[in-house]
Amino acid sequence: MSIRVEMAILVAVVAAVSMAEEPLARFGVISDIHLLPSDPHRSDVLRDALKYMDARKADGVVACGDLTQNGTVAELRAFGDIWRAVFPGNKRSDGEHVEKLFVYGDHDTEPTFLPGVFAHHKKHGVYPDWLLKRGDIVLNDRAKQWKAAFDEDFAPIMRKRVKGFDFVLAHLVNLDEDGMRYADPLHIPGLEEFFATNSFDSVKPFFYVQHKIPRGTVGGPTQTGQDSGRTSAILAKHPNAISFNGHKHRTATEELSLWQGAFTAIQSPALFTLLTAAGRENGRCSCDAALSDPPQQMAQINTIPDGSHALFLTIWPDRIVVDRVDIIHGGEPVAAPWVIKWPNDGSASFEARGKGVPAPQFAPGAKVTARKIVGSDRSGKKLAQIEVRFPPAQSTSTTPRAYDYEVRAVLRKALVTRIVATKRVYSPKCYWPEKYDTGDVTCLFGRFEIPNDHDSVTFEVRPLNAWGVAGGPIMTEPATYDKAKVLYPF
């Protein structure tokens, strides 16, 4: 048999498999776009995300709220204009229909972030009268502005069906038209009544979309930004429900952004300004300030110019594959896809997915160094520091890429050895696809964090996977450090 014939047979087989394996539906998921027309970067990122979803033939695009930065009419309409430019007439480039599956978030319907508003609201508990008389904010006519921006009627809770799959779209409307909060501002008004009067397939997945986190799901029990818990109680009656939320801006690399219990919950990453987990020395997390010992020695990772993640769902007859992608790099994967089996069998739970995941490992011969420097802490204050530097632990055929790193300062005095400081740190481009995150990782200690009375100090570094399992350490040679002088010079 000739090579040409063999190739023809192979092509035919591949085509047959492709036809047999045609997915049931495809959906893109974005959140926290925070569109601001005066910032062209945000518009570009949204446009790029929609073009990526067009190229992948999305049947619909979910947007989990915070479409705008300040909740103004101009921002909301700019979002609609970009949608129409990419999907004119709600059509993909191949002519097929694509559905808008959007909801309002707090930035869209709570104009707290406009100049002068936050301080007034914090002091008086209400919005200023002048704000509520403005015609250029979404809050003052949510339905009218939604229709003007997106060419569709608005309802606080909307139901749409796309390719046979139901979507429940629950807008964050926890303020009345006078700017006053409802009795339970962390809950979607009317949600219990909606589910009581709507029925859903008991086996086929259906999707629920809101901005804030259904309590007790993604991010773990200490995650901030959760709702009151009533949503979770409703969805728990539907094991085939899959919820989407935004709000916390977490990266797509977070394994805790997929939760499965009585139902399934997925946290969408942010399209603008990615945030990390709390407590990392160079992390970017609004929760750090609330910690008893917040990170102090390093500036936050700056994800604003180059951090933009999205999800893409492909629905098959027995599973849903969730691609976690980086829009800055054209939709390249930033982490391995999630696979959610349906019906819900619990295999996507934290416990099931974390079990048996190997620890990352440094490459053979990897070395870590420590040196004294004059640096700046997170507040910008100049001071004496110790810089610990090491290469990233990259993936191999048997081990994953490191999620973050634990760095310990180990002090020795006479016969006593003790850990005097422990830090967690990210690689500089932890939110990019691995092949672009190759630079050295640094972790800074204030010189004052190391007790003066020591014979030697060693720094030990361990790579951790996303579930906190540590690989083998690399360590510096023992060294001594002169008596601490907190500020410049040494």
Where are these regions (language model features)?
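A short C-terminal boundary segment appended to hydrolase-like catalytic domains
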Residues: 293-424, 470-474, 479-490
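Solvent-exposed serine/threonine-rich low-complexity stretches and specific carbohydrate-binding patches
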Residues: 417-437
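Signal that preferentially marks extracellular ectodomain short beta-strand elements
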Residues: 432-453
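Active-site-proximal beta-strand elements of phosphoester/diester hydrolases
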Residues: 24-37, 164-175, 207-209, 264-270, ...
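Extended active-site neighborhood of metal-dependent phosphoesterases/phosphodiesterases
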Residues: 73-196, 230-240, 253-304, 308-314, ...
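Beta-strand-rich modules
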Residues: 448-469
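Short acidic, glycine-rich surface-loop motifs adjacent to enzyme active sites
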Residues: 195-219
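N-terminal active-site segment of His-dependent metallophosphoesterases
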Residues: 19-77
